[in-house]
Structure formats: structure tokens, C-alpha cells
Amino acid sequence: MMNFRQRMGWIGVSLYLFVSAAAFYYVFEINETYNRLALEHVQLKPHEPHRGTTWTHSLKIRLLSLPFWLWAALFLIPYFQVFLFLYSCTRADPKTVGYCIIPICLAIICNRHQSFVKASNRISKLQLIDT
């Protein structure tokens, strides 16, 4: 039987996926501003900025010229981190909540490495004392 934390975790996962699907649909189907900006970016324009160009327009042009893999990494890494955290809340063992988040995972791996080094140093000191 599921406890309250697991139920709330599943509700959080389902809401997160629903909001993600709605945002994905909005960006790629409904939002005409995004489509207009994408078309402006593709059309050939002179390389010299106009005198009437504002800094926001030039910033939009520069941001749209970034490669796709960079945009994908900027959005997908935090997206998957939040999703994996919500998914870890659905597990039965409360001690395993949050282990899939990158900073926590790195801290655990480094802590295990340090404890392994300390243990190996203790073993080598014991061997020196015994001989």
C-alpha cells in the first residue's frame, strides 16, 4: 500500500508531465510570436544593425542563433532533474529520495571515494604496524 509521500509523488509526476505537454504544445503549435521570430531569423537580412534596432531585438537575434544542442541542454537537464526528483518521491524507501539529482549524486560518489581512500589508508597503516 502506498503512503502519503508516494501518492503525492505520483500526483506531482502526472501534473509535471501534463504541464510539460501543454507547454510543448503551446511553443510549437499555438505561439505565433515564436513562429514569427523564427521566420525573421531564417530570412536574409543585412549584417549591419539598423540604427533603430533596440538592444532587446539584437539580444533575441543572438539568442536564436545559438545551436540547437545548447538550447536542448539548457532546458532538458533541469527538466529531467526535476522529473527524476519527483519520480524518486514515488519510491517506497524515503532514504532514496533525491539521489538522482546531479549535485547530490556527485556528493555521494565523492563521499564514497573519500571513505574508500580513508579505509585503504587505515588498512595500509595496520599492515605497517603488524610487520
From Swiss-Prot:
Compartments, as annotated in UniProt: Golgi apparatus membrane
Database matches in Pfam families: TMEM251
InterPro entries membership: LYSET (IPR028024)
Single GO BP term: regulation of vesicle-mediated transport
Taxonomy, superkingdom: Eukaryota
Functional description taken from the UniProt entry: Required for mannose-6-phosphate-dependent trafficking of lysosomal enzymes. LYSET bridges GlcNAc-1-phosphate transferase (GNPTAB), to the membrane-bound transcription factor site-1 protease (MBTPS1), thus allowing proteolytic activation of the GNPTAB. GNPTAB is involved in the regulation of M6P-dependent Golgi-to-lysosome trafficking of lysosomal enzymes. LYSET is thus an essential factor for maturation and delivery of lysosomal hydrolases.
Protein family membership: Belongs to the LYSET family.
Protein name listed in UniProt: Lysosomal enzyme trafficking factor
Organism, scientific name: Xenopus laevis (African clawed frog)
Upper classification of the organism: Eukaryota, Metazoa, Chordata, Craniata, Vertebrata
